[in-house]
């Protein structure tokens, strides 16, 4: 069981985070941003009818003599660095605001398949990959956040390189690596991980037409973290990941700001 407290209290100039009776000196950690910024070049699924839009409402000096700016924004749930809530692929799954915070904050492992993905852009993580990882780095324990590093974030935001095809409205020719079905079952059903994430557009590989990994995860109320970046800056294990989405009532997903704390 993980002992990470849900409430993080920033302790003034000491730059310490109080975790129950413990304290973490933030200066002893490197904070790694795992999220792409939202903007005009943000990558969305080809069938998405819209993309991220930022509309300026105000920008400039006011009659009162002070500066003021404000915007409105609109975005599909599933694009950019975002989370898939279980209801995305299960009618009985949790909606975005129902996901327990302790599934989104905790110890992470990073499984590196960059060399395999470089040789086969449709590569899918296998159970043997997981077993080999555990032989080298120890068993993946209950409540772990699993991150799959394929090296694909290097293509962002080149849509054709990242997704394998840039035809608007057509998702039939996508090509990128991700989790394989059997590996997903091992991690979710046997290891009981808290969440799975990847530095590609989907927790299913690009050519998937039945989205079995999404369905397996949703059935167990395991969220998916997609379009992550900077996984090369994390160790195979030992990082603490905090992946907090917008709290959208009834949402099937939403924008995600994910960070990792790595000991210096």
Model-flagged regions — what are they?
Residues 3-6, 199:
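Intrinsically disordered, metal-sensing/regulatory segments
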Residues 5-16:
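Bacterial N-terminal signal peptides
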Residues 17-264:
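Active-/binding-site microenvironments in catalytic and ligand-binding cores
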């Amino acid at each position: 069981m993980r002992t990470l407290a849900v409430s993080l209290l920033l302790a003034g100039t000491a730059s310490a985070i109080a975790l129950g009776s413990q304290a973490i000196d933030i200066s002893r950690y490197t904070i790694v941003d795992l999220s792409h910024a939202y903007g005009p070049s943000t990558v969305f699924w080809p069938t998405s009818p819209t993309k991220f839009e930022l509309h300026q409402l105000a920008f400039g000096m006011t009659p009162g003599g002070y500066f003021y700016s404000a915007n409105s924004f609109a975005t599909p749930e599933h694009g950019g660095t975002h989370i898939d809530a279980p209801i995305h692929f299960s009618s009985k799954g949790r909606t975005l605001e129902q996901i327990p915070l302790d599934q989104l904050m905790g110890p992470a492992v990073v499984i590196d398949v960059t060399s395999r993905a470089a040789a086969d852009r449709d590569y899918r993580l296998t159970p043997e990959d997981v077993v080999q990882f555990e032989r080298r780095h120890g068993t993946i324990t209950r409540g772990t956040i699993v991150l799959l590093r394929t090296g694909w974030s290097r293509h962002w935001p080149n849509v054709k390189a990242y997704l394998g095809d840039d035809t608007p409205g057509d998702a039939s020719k996508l090509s990128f690596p991700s989790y394989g079905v059997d590996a997903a079952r091992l991690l979710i059903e046997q290891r009981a991980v808290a969440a799975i994430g990847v530095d590609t557009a989907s927790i299913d590989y690009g050519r998937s037409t039945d989205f079995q990994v999404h369905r397996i995860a949703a059935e167990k109320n395991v969220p998916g973290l997609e379009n992550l970046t900077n996984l090369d800056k994390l160790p195979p294990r030992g990082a603490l990941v905090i992946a907090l989405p917008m709290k959208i009532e009834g949402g099937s997903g939403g924008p995600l700001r994910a960070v990792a704390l790595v000991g210096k």
